[in-house]
């Protein structure tokens, strides 16, 4: 049930549900993407007279190599490569959960946020409804399951 924003990891989780309900066209869903924020305080520490060092053994030469590439060479590519792998895993899960083919050009898989009406029209959310509607649906599913168990269906 969506009563506000169902974005990113929340969208991933929500699409795994048996049915999704959204309260209003004003609600938002989507944001299938991944990002990383990088900050270095080394220059600040240096200006404060603090000698900040990261020391690695030769046997752990790949430890934190992505951030070290940024610090030493201003090279974001190693991090972008890892993020691309994680993004594809995210997209594949959404694709599987929604039953739609992965298309890297589709705005859904490029991080766009959609209003409730667009999300329902595109099949990203099953239907508009209230929390009560969602609870009734869950109870109905439980009843059907119980009847099926009773009659070995």
At which residue positions do the language-model features occur?
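N-terminal organellar transit peptides
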Residues: 1-27, 32-153
